[in-house]
UniProtKB/Swiss-Prot annotation:
Membrane-protein topology: Peripheral membrane protein
Protein name: Regulator of G-protein signaling 9
SUPFAM superfamilies: Regulator of G-protein signaling, RGS, Transducin (heterotrimeric G protein), gamma chain, Winged helix' DNA-binding domain
Keyword Cytoplasm: no
MF (Gene Ontology): GTPase activator activity
Organism in which the protein naturally occurs: Tamias striatus
Post-translational modification (record): Phosphorylation is decreased by light exposition.
Keywords attached to this entry: Membrane, Sensory transduction, Signal transduction inhibitor, Vision
Amino acid sequence: MTIRHQGQQYRPRMAFLQKIEALVKDMQNPDTGVKTQSQRVLVTSVPHAMTGGDVLQWIIQRLWISSLEAQNLGNFIVKYGYIYPLQDPKNLILKPDSSLYRFQTPYFWPTQQWPAEDTDYAIYLAKRNIKKKGILEEYEKENYNFLNKKINYKWDFVIMQAKEQYRAGKERNKADRYALDCQEKAYWLVHRCPPGMNDVLDYGLDRVTNPNEVKKQTITAVKKEIMYYQQALMRSTVKSSVSLGGIVKYSEQFSSNDAIMSGCLPSNPWITDDTQFWDLNAKLVEIPTKMRVERWAFNFSELIRDPKGRQSFQYFLRKEFSGENLGFWEACEDLKYGDQSKVKEKAEEIYKLFLAPGARRWINIDGKTMDITVKGLKHPHRYVLDAAQTHIYMLMKKDSYARYLKSPIYKEMLAKAIEPQETTKKSSTLPFIRRHLRSSPSPVILRQLEEEAKAREAANTVDITQVMSKLDRRSLLKKELPPK
């Protein structure tokens, strides 16, 4: 049997169908496969039929799996249309009894190139309409009317094809005609499933490109591949022990700055009511904490990422008459992550301020980088200054950063840095125990308490004698008053 391997290159999630097809081919082996024979269905003898129990037993013996796994796999095969039931076509499960099944012809397998188009489905429905004399199921009637409106321009062709196929089918013998009808019905139950059934072939939109297609390599592509492998050979390999040592060193270096592992100083504001931690670690606080200043010495990225560290580094660069380097880097960051509707204006402004001949804050970059940058500014975009920005970044990292750490500015900042002490709590002797926040009472509960208090006041018993005595006193006072 020759099976075309088509239709899967655009459907990466359907690649497992190849394994199912290989298993179905083994099932159809005349020597080691599932035993088939002619079976009588209604008044017709159908050739090459088999029972669900035989299929289940063959799967168990062939794959050495449990009966439950074999049942699930059998249901899987039936749902994808490789085996179809003869007696209950809509029930796409493998019954482990004497229910009759039949192998689907490879022409109707899901991996074939031809798709289930509307025209083919319309011809099938028109043929069933002729055969059943207009008695179709409800969902088939709806699809028939919908397709009649959708492809009305070629409906005459659909009816003509349906009549020709119906006429050709009547010329076949009864068994072949019944088998072909079952095959078509099983195919369309999978590809145009009725309402309420699971569409197992729903894989989404087709891909525009074929990821498995073998493309013809050009000379340029081969040269790039050779260059890549040459660079890979020249690249120095690192032992796993060295890599793991680097990870351990990094973890030890940053462990003191991990708020979860080492805690927060003076206290965690999310657990306590103290907001001093936020005040001490504000972006541009006047005097930062010692831990924050020490972190600037870890690497250059930690320094330039911190707004306070960047401010201190800018002050140092101005003293060295190279403050334009950090200014250019910040302008490039604003170009990349700022308002993109003003990219062109920002790029022109950066060029005039930092790159143009005789610019007020001219930066020193090599000629090759300058040529790439100027050429890219003809069509500006957010990454047009990446080459120049990388050059300046590496210049500051390798030259200015080391001098900054040795400068009096950094040493003075480190000496003045605050080292907050942990807030002690009398209620707890263990450092990891934290006082939980007390939530304020819910407004709903407060309203309920007020209503209950009013109800209690209204329910208090009233002394009638006291009320009557008060009314009598008021009436006597009115009588004793002299007339005006």
